[in-house]
From Swiss-Prot:
Keyword set includes Mitochondrion: yes
Transmembrane portions of the chain: 127-145, 170-189
Species for this entry: Vanderwaltozyma polyspora (strain ATCC 22028 / DSM 70294 / BCRC 21397 / CBS 2163 / NBRC 10782 / NRRL Y-8283 / UCD 57-17) (Kluyveromyces polysporus)
Name of the molecule in the record: MICOS complex subunit MIC27
Annotated gene: MIC27
UniProt GO BP: proton transmembrane transport
Mitochondrial matrix side: 146-169
Localization, UniProt: Mitochondrion inner membrane
Membrane topology, from the record: Multi-pass membrane protein
Stretches of the chain found on the membrane's Mitochondrial intermembrane side: 1-126, 190-260
GO CC field: mitochondrial inner membrane
Record bears the keyword Glycoprotein: no
Length: 260
């Protein structure tokens, strides 16, 4: 409230009737302000030193309350206040703009995911949520399996310590500890939600990874897994199935010939 009164300026000078002429150097002038601000209804009387070298002004309100202020200080404070208000307006404008940009990005991201990733209605309604929980369980299993402490390994050489074998070294080294949980989680999710998993891989390959790196990864995957491990495993499986059928047929023929 006091700063509101400091913002007021005397607007005119009047000399009361019946008073002697006023000496600018030895007497005080009487100034009248019609209205200090919107909160003051009655007129206020202001007394100030008439010297041009002193800008200190005393404001006397209708309830005999005096406020001493400096016109120069008042102008400075008013400038500071206007600067603060201007900076606050700029910050508010930036904040509103940032909120709108975040909302637009969120809307665009949701639309992109719905169109390119979660576009299989059956998996969205029935499989995605259970697949996420199962993948989390597989991730925890990978963490447990790759933790050296869970293998009874001890650096102190206690009675429960085990010898460092090949399997222990393969599963507990640093690359395995970093990759094995994610491999377990990804494989589990791909088995229970295959369409969504393929969409995720496609989005990562086309939109996130550099084209050259994505092509190199795809070629390595095809050469190592698709044309290598998967093809040989399918051939081995079909060979075992065929040999098993032939063996069963031979046994049945032998039993039949032996009986008849």
């Amino acid at each position: 409230m006091i700063f509101d009164y400091l913002y007021c300026k005397p607007v005119k000078e009047v000399v009361p009737k019946g008073s002697a002429p006023v000496d600018d150097l030895n007497h005080e002038l009487v100034k009248t302000i019609d209205k200090i601000d919107d909160n003051v209804d009655n007129a206020a009387i202001v007394e100030s030193n008439g010297s041009q070298w002193n800008d200190v002004v005393k404001y006397r309100l209708s309830d005999d309350v005096e406020i001493t202020g400096s016109e120069q200080l008042t102008e400075s404070i008013r400038g500071w206040r206007l600067n603060i208000v201007d900076e606050l307006d700029k910050l508010r404008s930036k904040w509103d703009t940032g909120k709108q940009e975040m909302y637009d990005k969120k809307t665009d991201t949701n639309a992109f995911l719905n169109d390119n990733v979660f576009n299989n209605k059956f998996e969205n309604e029935e499989l995605v949520v259970p697949s996420v929980f199962l993948s989390f369980g597989a991730f925890c299993s990978g963490r447990i399996l790759s933790n050296p402490k869970n293998w009874g390994h001890s650096k102190t050489g206690s009675l429960t310590a085990v010898r460092s074998g090949l399997l222990y070294k393969s599963l507990t080294n640093l690359p395995s500890r970093l990759l094995l949980p994610w491999i377990f989680a990804g494989y589990t999710f791909s088995q229970f939600s295959p369409k969504t998993f393929d969409n995720i891989c496609k989005v990562v390959e086309e939109d996130l990874l550099p084209p050259a790196f994505a092509k190199s990864c795809r070629d390595n995957w095809n050469s190592i897994y698709v044309n290598g491990i998967k093809k040989h495993s399918q051939g081995l499986s079909s060979s075992i199935d065929e040999n098993l059928q032939n063996s069963i047929r031979s046994i049945r023929e032998f039993i039949y010939k032996s009986l008849y």
